[in-house]
Amino acid sequence: MSIFFAFSDECGQYRTERSEGFLKGSPFYVRSALLINAENWKKLNEDFLILKEKYGLRKTDEIKWSYVWSLHKYLKDRKPIPEDKEFKRFESLGPEKLINFIADSLKLLLPINAKIVLTITDNRLCPRYTEVNLLKMHLQNVMQRLEMEMQLNDDLCV
């Protein structure tokens, strides 16, 4: 029996009531889950910290896709980034280098036997569920997929 870790996160926003402006900025709500063997996780984490150092990032830095987009927008519009913006500290890297960091981060998964589960809600087509119910549906779907993977070899997921 092997032990696996599952990490889950979301991207995008969801609202029961959606204006045209909201739909333009948030056409999708996406939840992802990464399933990885615990032994592989240790190596992946070490390699990820080395990669962060290579790019001049702190160990605790988290790069969000919205940061990349916001940096791109501010630079394109030639506007100064306000000091209170979370992505201000990445201004010196710029969006292109952040995209390279993201690509290099994903490449770390290539030699590892990992599974990625994505659940996607099209906000333009989705019925008006409450945010809590939509989250439950996404998590239930992810959990079902993880359980199916674990049953193959009688493995354990945390």
Regions found by a protein language model. Give the residues of each.
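Phosphate-ester processing/binding pockets and catalytic centers
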Residues: M1-V158
